[in-house]
Amino acid sequence: MQPTMRIIVSMALLAYAVASAYHSNVKLRRDGKMVLYPFPRVGRASGNTWQLPLNDLYPEYEPAQVKRQLYAFPRVGRDPVMSRLGRSDLSRVESHEFQPMAVRRTESPGMWFGPRLGRAFKNDDDEITIQNESNDHSEPEQTELIHEDRRKRQTLN
């Protein structure tokens, strides 16, 4: 065989071997989701609840089996005042002390989410005027939908 043909055949065999090893590999590829645990996360409200007696909660399981399935994660991004509350203070949080206040509605048509969103009235500036009326432009779209009666398609039984 010629040297160029040998190189081409060896490159093809090498590519085939790499591709078959890549597809049949038992080890999973690492991507952004591989570092997440597929187990339920158990968050703790305060430091008093970190040491829970697992035997009382799960009497039918062995403790080693329960510990393998549940991961305790701290509450990241929570309010620091709420994270320092004990279990006795949680009843106060559930009461009406921490409920949000009712928002007063005003009658003025002000901006709600930002400019040009939530406007309650129409300005004279909003009218669309066609400056160059010629035949080469298409008609503007209709704003009201025209309801047409549709006939049922005949089907063979």
UniProtKB/Swiss-Prot annotation:
One of its GO terms (cellular component) is extracellular region. Residues 1-21 form the signal peptide. It is found in: Secreted. Keywords: Amidation, Cleavage on pair of basic residues, Neuropeptide, Pyrrolidone carboxylic acid, Secreted, Signal. The modification Pyrrolidone carboxylic acid is found at Q69. Its main location: secreted. The modification Valine amide is found at V42, V76. CAPA-periviscerokinin 1: Expressed in corpora cardiaca (CC), corpora allata (CA), antennal lobe (AL) and gnathal ganglion (GNG) (at protein level). Expression detected in most animals in CC and CA and in some animals in AL and GNG (at protein level). CAPA-periviscerokinin 2: Expressed in corpora cardiaca (CC), corpora allata (CA), antennal lobe (AL) and gnathal ganglion (GNG) (at protein level). For non-pyroglutamate form, expression in AL detected in all animals, in CC, CA and GNG in most animals (at protein level). One of its GO terms (molecular function) is neuropeptide hormone activity. Residues 22-28, 45-66, 120-157 form a propeptide. The modification Leucine amide is found at L85, L117. Residues 131-157 are annotated as: Disordered. GO terms for biological process: neuropeptide signaling pathway. Transmembrane segments: none annotated. Residues 134-151 have a biased composition (Basic and acidic residues). Belongs to the pyrokinin family. This is CAPA peptides. The lineage of its organism: Eukaryota, Metazoa, Ecdysozoa, Arthropoda, Hexapoda.
